[in-house]
């Protein structure tokens, strides 16, 4: 039942998204849902996976008490289970939604430490990347306490299992099921020749391990946290770990992972 369930809607700048968001808002208000952007129970994204990622980061520090639901205004996405033609089904699903049956996906904790002792901590749903603006990046890569390699190339991407189908896949990474509690590190255009060597392939790193990148001192590093990009200098280290933080999706019409992969990259199989 509804009982005044608190929701909030987030869309993108497209006219179609604005139109669908407005229509869904009217339906939800008529059904006595409470609109609360400060402490929502469910955040509904109207757009694509990028809109859902933006919504997640808007509520990054409330993930322990917020669930998400995606309405796609184009085609089925990895984080969006409904289309713009399913608005009444969305409302019905929200009525029946049970928090105890939410679907949980792991997030990667990213801790950036600077040479002056300052630190920032973020969580990512898809991936985090590090690269330099226009020159070769050099950095030591540690797996837990072991110095694994000295990387040279354009950059590195560290992804979650759900994020393995995003940027990670485009740079040759493996697709990993979300039930596999692991991180994946993939190289971005690494240098491999008789002088410089890296592993040259993606790696699946176990849940108990950490990945630490210690980049060479430079002042033009670019870090991404999902779709958010920041420029930094004086970076001492970047540590990636699975600390148990998850994102929760309302279990309304959840599409199985391999079905999502097949529909997104293969299409109909005859």
Curated annotation (Swiss-Prot):
Enzyme Commission (EC) number: 2.7.1.23
Entries under InterPro entries matching the protein: ATP-NAD_kinase_N, ATP-NAD_kinase_PpnK-typ_C, NAD/diacylglycerol_kinase_sf, NADK
Primary location: cytoplasm
Top enzyme category: transferase
Catalyzed chemical reaction(s): NAD(+) + ATP = ADP + NADP(+) + H(+)
GO-annotated molecular function: ATP binding; metal ion binding; NAD binding; NAD+ kinase activity
Residue spans crossing the bilayer: none
Pfam family, one: NAD_kinase
Subcellular locations according to the entry: Cytoplasm
Keywords: ATP-binding, Cytoplasm, Kinase, NAD, NADP, Nucleotide-binding, Transferase
UniProt-listed Gene3D superfamilies: Probable inorganic polyphosphate/atp-NAD kinase, domain 1 (3.40.50.10330), Probable inorganic polyphosphate/atp-NAD kinase, domain 2 (2.60.200.30)
GO cellular component: cytoplasm
Residues annotated as binding NAD(+): 49-50, 54, 126-127, 152, 154, 165-170, 189, 227
Biological process annotations from GO: NAD metabolic process; NADP biosynthetic process
Active-site residues, record numbering mapped to chain: 49 (proton acceptor)
Cofactor(s) the protein needs: a divalent metal cation
Known role: Involved in the regulation of the intracellular balance of NAD and NADP, and is a key enzyme in the biosynthesis of NADP. Catalyzes specifically the phosphorylation on 2'-hydroxyl of the adenosine moiety of NAD to yield NADP.
Family: Belongs to the NAD kinase family.
Protein known as: NAD kinase
């Amino acid at each position: 039942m509804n009982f005044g369930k608190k929701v909030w809607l987030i869309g993108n700048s497209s006219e179609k998204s604005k139109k669908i968001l407005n229509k869904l808002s009217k339906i939800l208000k008529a059904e006595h849902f409470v609109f609360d952007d400060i402490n929502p129970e469910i955040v509904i994204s109207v757009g694509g996976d990028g809109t859902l990622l933006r919504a997640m980061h808007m509520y990054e520090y409330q993930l322990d008490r917020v669930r998400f639901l995606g309405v796609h205004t184009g085609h089925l996405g990895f984080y969006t289970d409904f289309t713009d033609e399913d608005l009444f089904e969305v409302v019905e699903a929200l009525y029946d939604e049970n928090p105890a049956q939410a679907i949980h996906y792991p997030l990667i904790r990213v801790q950036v430490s600077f040479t002056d002792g300052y630190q920032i901590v973020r969580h990512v749903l898809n991936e985090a990347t590090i690269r330099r603006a226009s020159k070769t990046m050099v950095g030591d890569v540690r797996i837990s306490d072991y110095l694994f390699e000295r990387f040279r190339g354009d950059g590195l991407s560290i992804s979650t299992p759900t994020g393995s189908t995003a940027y990670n896949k485009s740079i040759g990474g493996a697709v990993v099921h979300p039930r596999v509690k692991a991180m994946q590190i993939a190289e971005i255009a690494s240098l491999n020749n008789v002088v410089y060597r890296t592993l040259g392939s993606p790696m699946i790193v176990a849940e108990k391990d950490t990945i630490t990148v210690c980049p060479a001192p430079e002042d033009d590093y670019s870090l991404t946290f999902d779709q958010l990009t920041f420029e930094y200098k004086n970076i001492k280290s970047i540590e990636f770990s699975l600390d148990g933080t998850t994102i929760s999706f309302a279990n309304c019409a959840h599409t199985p992972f391999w079905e999502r992969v097949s529909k997104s990259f293969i299409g109909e199989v005859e």
